[in-house]
Curated annotation (Swiss-Prot):
The UniProt record lists the keyword Iron: no
Protein name: tRNA1(Val) (adenine(37)-N6)-methyltransferase
Enzyme Commission number(s) from the entry: 2.1.1.223
Organism of this sequence: Escherichia coli O157:H7
GO biological process: methylation; tRNA processing
Record field: catalytic activity: adenosine(37) in tRNA1(Val) + S-adenosyl-L-methionine = N(6)-methyladenosine(37) in tRNA1(Val) + S-adenosyl-L-homocysteine + H(+)
Main function: Specifically methylates the adenine in position 37 of tRNA(1)(Val) (anticodon cmo5UAC).
Swiss-Prot/TrEMBL keywords: Cytoplasm, Methyltransferase, S-adenosyl-L-methionine, Transferase, tRNA processing
Family matches, as CDD domains: AdoMet_MTases
PANTHER family assigned to the protein according to its UniProt record, in alphabetical order: TRNA1(VAL) (ADENINE(37)-N6)-METHYLTRANSFERASE
Amino acid sequence: MSQSTSVLRRNGFTFKQFFVAHDRCAMKVGTDGILLGAWAPVAGVKRCLDIGAGSGLLALMLAQRTSDSVIIDAVELESEAATQAQENVAQSPWLERINVHTADIQQWVTQQTARFDLIISNPPYYEQGVECATPQREQARYTTSLDHQTLLTCAAECITEEGFFCVVLPEQIGNSFTELALSMGWHLRLRTDVAENEARLPHRVLLAFSPQAGECFSDRLVIRGPDQNYSEAYTALTQAFYLFM
């Protein structure tokens, strides 16, 4: 896919090595997903799982960041989104490495014998509240179809002993998610608090949990500098993906 043609495509987001159409997905490509896909630790991974794949963004980002031997499974409950994810994968350089499954993750994990050393999810985080325009968007935004305890349980069922389970969440919800994970036997190993600029409090948090205990490394990421341009740290993290960075 050449940049000269892909940059003109609509109803999606053009990255340096792939295009993500998202017009049939409830949740669109956004900063949260891009942060998570660029941040998740991939060193030494052999098999990855994307829970709630949506458009396939995270699976595609992981494919770009990992070697040709790494297999990625992407599970999406909503059929229209799963179909679009399959189409996005088919048009990418990594068709042979990414498997998109239209399935309920709770049922899907019970059928798996393989274990994953990296599991990634940009999960729903709102409790039932303001009505959404469509049932698909409600499913993507609210925890009614996949609450956080169920998500943590599903990840625990198919992760390797030294694997990482990575999520991105709003700051306060991330704190309660961490408390829940610790109570279920997970160990927090990586935490990055994300702020829009130096003057603002963090609004998102990137979290990596593991079944294996170990030191927790924490840091802070500022997206924009005083000049409102992307910060050096954010640029370093995401420049392999953004088309004009």
